């Protein structure tokens, strides 16, 4: 009876916000402050080589280059960050997006793994529990399905089941979306974004151009650091090397690198042709340049 009386008097969860709090903590002001906090200037110079070589002092670049630059910046900012996956070290990944990171930060922070996504995401959880900031890479979105439960059943549920006593923050990079015409049925081209979207507590970011990618990465890393969130950064393979938008050589899909104190607000949108009144198109990833070309 004493136990029953004690249970009866224990405070109850009465609102959906109270139930959701440990599953999806959100501290917008703290996240904004962390996302816009630049790495130490001296450290950045050491990483990039000189003032002239800082990415914000370079010409406009395409998506793959700016993700690479943003990763270098994150590693300069967070000494506890780690990047690992299949062929990400010396080779720089299938699309060379991680090229140079191994040389700059050595094998203790950038290293290859077995060709096993379950192992990659299991390592990420272990490192996160140790206080590190892991950025595991899943080589293709199709490969994520082999290890989906590591995120759905483990990483994203830890805060909820422990009432926020334990956290495993991470930013999982995943290359995906369609990228080869006439090759849509191939295993590498599996485009099941639903596998990410339907995971409770998971934050999914998907850029379409370089500057947005850099600022989005900063915000995702900040959400992981501040609120312990598990984040997925979905990188459109078809746009990695895309420089032009309407015509060959127009360079309209190459963008300047955003200053290190700039970041995207969680849930913020980029609006194109804001004065148009005939039609509204809401899209992401590959759909953005397609929609812009269609509108023209």
Which residues does each PLM region occupy?
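Active-site or pore-adjacent capping/gating segments
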Residues: 1-20
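Composition- and surface-driven signal marking solvent-exposed, interaction-prone regions
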Residues: 18-23, 294-296
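Thiamine diphosphate
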Residues: 22-241
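Glycine-/acidic-rich phosphate or pyrophosphate-binding loops and their flanking alpha/beta elements
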Residues: 66-74, 215-230, 239-296
């Amino acid at each position: 009876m004493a136990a029953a009386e004690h249970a009866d008097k224990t405070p109850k969860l009465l609102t959906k916000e109270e139930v959701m709090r440990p599953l999806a903590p959100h501290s917008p002001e703290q996240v904004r402050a962390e996302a816009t906090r630049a790495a130490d200037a001296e450290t950045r110079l050491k990483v990039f080589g000189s003032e002239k070589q800082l990415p914000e002092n370079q010409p406009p670049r395409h998506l793959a280059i700016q993700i690479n630059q943003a990763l270098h910046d994150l590693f300069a900012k967070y000494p506890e960050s780690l990047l690992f996956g299949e062929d990400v070290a010396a080779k720089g990944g299938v699309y060379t997006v991680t090229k140079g990171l191994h040389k700059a930060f050595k094998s203790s922070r950038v290293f290859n793994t077995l060709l096993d996504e379950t192992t990659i995401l299991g390592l990420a959880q272990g490192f996160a529990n140790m206080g590190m900031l892991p950025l595991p890479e899943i080589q293709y979105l199709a490969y994520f399905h082999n290890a989906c439960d590591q995120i759905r059943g483990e990483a994203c549920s830890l805060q909820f089941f422990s009432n926020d006593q334990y956290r495993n923050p991470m930013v999982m990079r995943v290359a995906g979306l369609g990228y080869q015409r006439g090759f849509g049925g191939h295993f590498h081209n599996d485009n099941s974004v639903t596998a990410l979207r339907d995971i409770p507590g998971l934050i999914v970011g998907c850029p379409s151009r370089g500057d947005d990618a850099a600022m989005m990465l900063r915000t995702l890393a900040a959400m992981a650091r501040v609120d312990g969130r598990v984040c997925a950064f979905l990188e459109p393979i078809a746009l990695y090397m895309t420089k032009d938008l309407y015509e060959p050589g127009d360079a309209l899909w190459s963008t300047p690198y955003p200053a290190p104190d700039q970041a995207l607000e969680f849930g913020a949108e980029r609006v194109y042709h804001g004065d148009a009144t005939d039609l509204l198109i809401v899209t992401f990833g590959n759909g953005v340049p397609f929609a812009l070309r269609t509108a023209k």
